[in-house]
Amino acid sequence: MATEAPIEATEVPPASATETVAKQPHKLERRWTFWFDNQSKPKQGAAWGSSLRKAYTFETVEEFWSLYDQIFKPSKLTANADFHLFKAGIEPKWEDPECASGGKWTVTSSRKANLETMWLETLMALVGEQFDESEEICGVVASVRRSQDKLSLWTKTASNEAIQMSIGRKWKEIIDAEKISYSFHDDSKRERSAKSRYTV
């Protein structure tokens, strides 16, 4: 009775390099965390930030798109709610050591579609490390309000005007905004509507 010859290892077709690469997740330069904050029904006497919740931390392109598509679109938010994307390890609070001496670039919009587009463009720029001063950036906040929505890019060193202006010009280009302004967190702590220190 004839027996089948054993298959030599060299006869087994190797998996193509492209298939192997396609199956591997695409790691980002750093880990990022999505946060959620809903201030629509604040509890009496609750401290600011008490409704802030850490949602998901991710480190691959695939995880980012899955989370964005399923959850983290501003159009899914109710009024007085916020989405945050910050570097892992940094909390979206003035008190965080990385944010304490910082400030934020802000753009406002009265159209929900604009906020959605600017939010996505900013997220892609952050996780894709498109800013030359990426180490100076803490994260971004999308705030949905009844009258006007707001997008804020938080940075570490408010007093360094040269760095902030460079970041501001780049961000303005990314989101295709007419005007954005920068305020210091220290000013915001003292006054509800802090004046703008820089504008582009």
UniProtKB/Swiss-Prot annotation:
Q: Which UniProt keywords apply?
A: Cytoplasm, Disulfide bond, Host-virus interaction, Initiation factor, Nucleus, Plant defense, Protein biosynthesis, RNA-binding, Translation regulation
Question: What role does this protein play?
Answer: Component of the protein complex eIF4F, which is involved in the recognition of the mRNA cap, ATP-dependent unwinding of 5'-terminal secondary structure and recruitment of mRNA to the ribosome. Recognizes and binds the 7-methylguanosine-containing mRNA cap during an early step in the initiation of protein synthesis and facilitates ribosome binding by inducing the unwinding of the mRNAs secondary structures. Key component of recessive resistance to potyviruses.
Disulfide topology: 99-138
Effect on the protein upon substituting residue 190 to K: In allele eIF4E2b
Q: What is this protein called?
A: Eukaryotic translation initiation factor isoform 4E
**Can you name the source organism?**
Nicotiana tabacum (Common tobacco)
Question: Does the keyword Cell division belong to this entry?
Answer: no
Superkingdom of source: Eukaryota
Subunit structure, interactors included:
EIF4F is a multi-subunit complex, the composition of which varies with external and internal environmental conditions. It is composed of at least EIF4A, EIF4E and EIF4G. EIF4E is also known to interact with other partners. In higher plants two isoforms of EIF4F have been identified, named isoform EIF4F and isoform EIF(iso)4F. Isoform EIF4F has subunits p220 and p26, whereas isoform EIF(iso)4F has subunits p82 and p28. (Microbial infection) Interacts with viral genome-linked protein (VPg); this interaction is possible in susceptible hosts but impaired in resistant plants.
- Tell me the residue numbers annotated for binding mRNA: 44-49, 76, 94-95, 145-150, 189-192
Explain the post-translational modification.
Answer: According to the redox status, the Cys-99-Cys-138 disulfide bridge may have a role in regulating protein function by affecting its ability to bind capped mRNA.
Q: In which tissues is it expressed?
A: Expressed ubiquitously in seedlings, roots, leaves, sepals, petals, anthers and dehisced pollen, with highest levels in pollen, maturing anthers and roots. Strongly expressed in susceptible plants but not in resistant ones.
What effect does gene inactivation have here? Plants lacking both eIF4E and eIFiso4E are semi-dwarf and exhibit an overall reduction in polyribosome loading.
The Gene Ontology terms for molecular function here are: RNA 7-methylguanosine cap binding; translation initiation factor activity
Which GO BP terms apply? Answer: defense response; regulation of translation; response to virus; translational initiation
GO cellular component terms? eukaryotic translation initiation factor 4F complex; nucleus
Q: What else is known?
A: Displayed sequence is allele 2 / eIF4E2a.
Location of the protein in the cell? Cytoplasm; Nucleus
Transmembrane ranges, per UniProt, are none
